[in-house]
């Protein structure tokens, strides 16, 4: 829905993908109930840290979450992503399988601009590539893609 609104109103849209670091190991060490509890805490944390009425957050699959920020600058999206990354880390959920000692998240973000003629799946792919770059370069960090072009 937000995608269609952004297209119709010719406004920029930012997609932010979050992936809980080492989540399979977390489930293996602490059990699936603890994993479910950790995901619920992360989801609440994400929801608590998006402020504007049209910003949306959802579970994207497994241990991944997506945030949609309509009419947002790259600087604004980076700020929201960093606030959420820090807040997830500050939850302090113990995770001895992580080099950080607690649950963290890696984050990738991408933008869609009105000048583009791409589908939402292309922007999700670019955000996913940024997410994997964050994981490959140390985890528990935010990686913004360059401005997406179709």
Regions found by a protein language model. Name each.
Residues 14-16, 58, 108-110, 143:
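Conserved beta-strand cores of small sensory beta-sandwich domains that regulate signal transduction
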Residues 68-70, 110:
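Short hydrophobic/aromatic beta-strand micro-patches
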């Amino acid at each position: 829905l937000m995608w269609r609104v952004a297209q119709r109103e010719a406004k920029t849209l930012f997609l932010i993908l979050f992936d809980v670091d080492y989540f399979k190991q977390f489930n293996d060490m602490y059990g699936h109930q603890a994993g479910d509890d950790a995901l619920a805490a992360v989801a609440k944390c994400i929801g608590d840290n998006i402020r504007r009425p049209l910003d949306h957050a959802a579970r994207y699959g497994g241990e991944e979450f997506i945030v949609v920020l309509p009419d947002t600058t790259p600087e604004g999206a980076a700020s929201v992503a960093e606030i959420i990354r820090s807040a997830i880390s500050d939850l302090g959920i113990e995770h001895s399988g992580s080099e950080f000692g607690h649950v963290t998240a890696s984050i990738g973000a991408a933008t869609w601009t009105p000048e583009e003629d791409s589908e939402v799946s292309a922007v999700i792919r670019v955000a996913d590539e940024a997410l994997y770059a964050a994981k490959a370069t140390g985890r528990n960090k935010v990686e913004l893609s360059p401005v997406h072009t179709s």
